[in-house]
Amino acid sequence: MSEIDWRKMPPLTALRAFAATASEGGFSAAARKLNVTHAAIAQQVRALEADLDVPLVWRDGKHLHLTPEGERFAKALADGFSMIQSAADMLRADTSEKALTVTVPPVFASEWLMPRLARFWKKHPDIPLSLLPDARLVDLKEIGANIGIRFGVGKWPGVISVFLTAAPQVVVAAPELLGGRKKLSLREMAMLPWVREGDWPEQMQLLESMGLVPAALKFVDFPNEELALAAAREGIGLHLETEALIVEDLKLGWLVKIHELTEESLGYYIVRPPGRLNPAAKIFIDWLKAEA
């Protein structure tokens, strides 16, 4: 293939205008196709004819026709643009097969996923990964996510769910709130303030399953789990949390576990839409399960 002399190459806008004129059969139709004005298309085609010093179109009343030279050039452009589009589509497909978008509860992302994520990137540096922290049950397709991680019992409509890890719930508190105690009776827990996140209604049922009366407890409310957990670390109140998310807090003594719930149905699940799985998503799912 001979080297391209870019200085002799006609402007791309003029080539597009003529190719559209040839395929659509006129300036007006080409203008609609390219979302520009009739005058802009006509001007570009005239400029191309001047650049090539060859007539490409001719008029017969209201009808526009291609000259023999115009027909040959239009075919060459159609073939060339078709090859460019095919190559671009292949690149986009390759990129979309590798790209991965994951929706995940914010605290799970910060406390469980982020400490492990460097290992994934080290092993798979070619997979672009985007995290969408969101505590809501979002529609994966609507937000453009390949997979999601959800907390619950593993039953949600419209998705395939795969168990990732158990989520035993524990009651924790900062050491200063407990005054040196390691365990509290139900009566003692009922007398202390509680830190609560507003977007987790099931926590009231869990507290009730412990033998507490939620309506009689004093709550300090926070809009999300991140702030509620931060408040618990500061000693503002007792807090119900997934043990897997506070392993470091317990190990370092920032929080003390004072009660374990026996509820075993809760867990974190990987969810995805039905149908073919993105290859990058399969790699990430396999890695998640190995980490868990």
UniProtKB/Swiss-Prot annotation:
Residues 10-67 form the HTH lysR-type domain. Keywords: Activator, DNA-binding, Transcription, Transcription regulation. The keyword Transcription regulation applies. Transmembrane segments: none annotated. One of its GO terms (molecular function) is DNA-binding transcription factor activity. GO terms for biological process: DNA-templated transcription. Gene3D superfamilies: Periplasmic binding protein-like II, Winged helix-like DNA-binding domain superfamily/Winged helix DNA-binding domain. Residues 27-46 bind DNA. InterPro entries: LysR_subst-bd, Tscrpt_reg_HTH_LysR, WH-like_DNA-bd_sf, WH_DNA-bd_sf. The keyword Iron does not apply. Functions as a low-light activator of ahcY expression (gene for S-adenosyl-L-homocysteine hydrolase) and as a high-light activator of an uncharacterized 21.6 kDa protein in the ahcY-hvrB intergenic region (orf5). It is also a negative regulator of its own expression. PANTHER family: HTH-TYPE TRANSCRIPTIONAL REGULATOR, TRANSCRIPTIONAL REGULATOR-RELATED. This is AhcY transcriptional activator HvrB.
